[in-house]
UniProtKB/Swiss-Prot annotation:
It comes from Homo sapiens (Human). This is Probable ATP-dependent RNA helicase DHX35. It catalyses: ATP + H2O = ADP + phosphate + H(+). Pfam families: HA2_C, HA2_N, Helicase_C, OB_NTP_bind. One of its GO terms (molecular function) is RNA helicase activity. A motif (DEAH box) lies at residues 176-179. InterPro entries: DEAD-box_helicase_OB_fold, DNA/RNA_helicase_DEAH_CS, HA2_WH, Helicase-assoc_dom, Helicase_ATP-bd, Helicase_C-like, P-loop_NTPase. GO terms for cellular component: catalytic step 2 spliceosome; nucleoplasm. ATP binds at residues 77-84. Identified in the spliceosome C complex. May be involved in pre-mRNA splicing. It is an enzyme of class 3 (hydrolase). One of its GO terms (biological process) is mRNA splicing, via spliceosome. The lineage of its organism: Eukaryota, Metazoa, Chordata, Craniata, Vertebrata.
Length: 703
């Protein structure tokens, strides 16, 4: 088919490209800490009428029949078919929550667990937290006696198994959005298969928005004969309301999909009929860039006398809910809506009125390189499954068109599906959880997609260095078990547990809590320089960790005042959440009898404590003007958002995480003394042969 925009070349992720920015989300990606809205197009109808309008309603009795007769049911249904909100209610109505039993529904994202729980509670006329509740990290909104439908993240389900390995209170577990194949979805999948062998009465529903159902069926089906009548797993497809979508490819690649997205929107607006536009990009920064460019284009078109106007709206998980709701608002016939979104709009929400889809062909994923032991966010080409999901967004209300900003040949070379997180993540938290659940031989654990052996070895080495595993790779007592109990990266857990010994548990609690929050700084586009000047008042020469401590302490000193946050361009909701997280972490420190101590303003105590947890993330300034990791000599740079950026580079630093755009950038960076690494982590920098040991020691010792 004809190409919608002109010929140019693709840029490769990892090279300098105008479509990529260094101001990116935290490792968690914005979905986990943002707000997701639940849009209801049938709000004018009664609750019962609304429920009956959903495609899944026609299959209610059939779904209940299959759950009664099969241990596992794989349900394939597009976003908006009602599977997430209705199936748990069908189960409750059919008696699966009688006699104190619970239906559990997992979500890969915290915000989805909260918002879907809220919608189900509303439909049932219940108070959220009573019959219907949710449980996410640092926030348990359930009643142990009353809750019968429980929404929770897959990570929290795995944590529940540490207390109740057979999940005895649950009659049914529904793994929702299983196609996302997150780290903890995959662990839950493997563990639930083990539980099913011991609990024949436990029913499992695997809900997916993509056609990967065969993989799930093959994994869970315990029928070892050739007789299909003995299958324990079955697939059911919920037909949605879809229309054909014409696909348009480029004739030759483009170098800048940001610019091409804008050009394609303008071309659609000038040449195509009615219908709204949905454009997919990789992150918040790109979305905001395209929105501002399109607003300029819309003004220019209005000046030419064009009667139909453009209403340009952003959509990403970190956007406040009232801003997200704007994408669902109806507009007059003289206005065309253009929604510029991240992949949150791929399967998480359904927006009516979309006829035209623009797919940039890329997505931002977390990726771990076991050779360098660096985990970072990286922009990579989408999978064919994701590209098809994106295209399908244009065929919900009538036939649509999808403009792919890449060639058909490029599409044919895309991977069929996204690589599961299990095969591209740092596995230290996974191994720790499995060990805590009594699975000693993690290499033989039944993973749906086995992780690379090198990643497993790296994770075991880090956990041994942290003191969480002994030389036989068994969980240590009490340190290993305690690290496993923290709902945090093992490095954070070790830092917190050591804080009493360093005499700074009060400060470390605040720092750890602040590091879990995304986007503490607010930078309005029209007040950028002023906001940055105000932010500098909190900065200290030691780096980002103590700067975050300063901000938190100032917030508490000013009685958590929202007006004070506004005046200082700080994220009020984020700081309130940091205070909540801190309280939860404090309870764990009390449980483990970590002394309540303050450093009384001595920064070295705090910095040494941080090194005790994050020694593996150390880098040294090199004569080339960049930093180098100590163990494998990998090049890193200080992120422009760091208070250390544009200052005289410290010789030695530690960092929380790395993101990759045009370079590898360290985020949350703090200056340290090299001697602290040898003092606090000799076991990490003294492994291997005598020769390599000498080389490592030489690297860490200042000349």
């Amino acid at each position: 088919m004809a190409a919608p925009v002109g010929p140019v070349k693709f840029w490769r992720p990892g090279t300098e490209g105008p479509g990529v920015s260094i101001s990116e989300e935290r490792q968690s990606l914005a979905e986990n800490s943002g707000t997701t809205v639940v849009y209801n197009p049938y709000a004018a109808l009664s609750i019962e009428q609304q429920r009956q309008k959903l495609p899944v309603f026609k299959l209610r009795n059939h779904i209940l029949y299959l759950i009664e007769n099969y241990q596992t049911v794989v349900i394939v249904g597009e976003t908006g078919c009602g599977k997430s909100t209705q199936i748990p209610q069908y189960l409750a109505e059919a008696g699966w929550t009688a006699e104190g039993r619970v239906v559990g529904v997992t979500q890969p994202r915290r915000v989805a667990a909260v918002t879907v729980a809220g919608r189900v509670a509303e439909e049932r006329g219940a108070v959220l937290g009573h019959e219907v509740g949710y449980c996410i990290r640092f926030d348990d909104c359930t009643d142990q006696l009353a809750t019968r439908i429980k929404f929770l993240t897959d990570g929290m389900l795995v944590r529940e198994m540490m207390v109740d390995p057979l999940l005895t209170k649950y009659s049914v577990i529904m793994l929702d959005e299983a196609h996302e194949r997150t780290l903890y979805t995959d662990i839950a999948i493997g563990l639930l298969k083990k539980i099913q062998k011991k609990r024949g009465d436990l029913r499992l529903i695997v809900a997916s928005a993509t056609l990967d159902a065969d993989k799930f069926r093959d994994f869970f089906n315990q029928n070892e004969t050739s007789d299909p009548a003995r299958d324990t797993c079955v697939i059911l497809t919920v037909e949605g309301r879809t229309f054909p979508v014409d696909i348009f490819y480029l004739q030759s690649p483009v170098p800048d999909y940001i610019k091409s997205t804008v050009e394609t929107v303008v071309k659609i607006h000038q040449t195509e009929g009615d219908g709204d536009v949905l454009a997919f990009l990789t992150g918040q920064e790109e979305v905001e860039t395209v929105v501002s460019m399109l607003i300029e284009q819309a003004r220019a078109l209005a000046r030419t006398g064009m009667k139909r106007h453009l209403r340009v709206l952003p959509m990403y998980a970190g956007l406040p809910s009232f801003e997200q709701m704007k994408v669902f608002e109806r507009v007059s016939r003289s206005v065309r809506k253009v929604i510029v979104a991240t992949n949150v709009a791929e399967t998480s929400i359904t927006i009516s009125g979309i006829v035209y889809v623009i797919d940039c062909g890329f997505v931002k994923l977390r990726a771990y390189n076991p050779r360098t032991a660096i985990e970072c966010l990286v922009v990579v080409p989408v999978s064919q499954a994701s590209a098809n999901q994106r295209a399908g967004r244009g065929g919900r209300s009538r036939s649509g068109k999808c403009y792919r900003l890449y060639t058909e040949e490029a599409f044919d070379k895309l991977p069929q599906s996204t690589v599961p997180e299990m095969q591209r993540s740092n596995l230290a938290p996974v191994i720790l959880q499995l060990k805590a659940l009594g699975i000693d031989n993690v290499l033989r654990f039944h993973f749906m997609s086995p992780p690379p052996a090198q990643s497993m070895v790296q994770a075991l080495e880090l956990l041994y260095a942290l003191g969480g595993l002994d030389k036989d790779c068994r969980l240590t007592e009490p340190l290993g078990m305690r690290i496993a109990e923290f709902p945090l990266n093992p490095m954070f857990a070790k830092m917190l547990l050591e804080s009493g010994n360093f005499g700074c548990s009060q400060e470390i609690l605040s720092i750890a809590a602040m590091m879990q929050i995304q986007n503490i700084f607010v930078v309005p586009p029209n007040q950028k320089s002023h906001a940055i000047r105000v932010h500098r008042k909190f900065a200290v020469e030691e780096g980002d960790h103590l700067t975050m401590l300063n901000i938190y302490e100032a917030f508490i000193k000013h009685n958590k005042d929202s007006k004070w946050c506004q005046e200082h361009f700080l994220n009020y909701k984020g700081l309130v959440r940091a205070a909540t997280v801190r309280e939860q972490l404090k309870k764990l420190l009390v449980k483990f009898q970590v002394p309540r101590k303050s450093s009384e303003g001595d920064p070295d105590l705090v910095l040494r404590c941080i090194v005790s947890g994050f020694f593996a993330n150390a880098a040294r300034f090199h004569s080339t003007g960049a930093y180098r990791t100590i163990r494998d000599d990998h090049e890193l740079h200080i992120h422009p958002a760091s208070v250390l950026y544009a200052e005289k580079p410290p010789r030695w630093v530690i960092y929380n995480e790395v993101i990759q755009t045009s370079k590898y950038y360290m985020r949350d960076v703090t200056a340290i003394e090299s001697a602290w690494l040898l003092e606090l982590a000799p076991h990490f920098y003294q492994q291997g042969t005598h020769l390599s040991l000498k080389a490592k020691r030489a690297k860490v010792q200042d000349p």
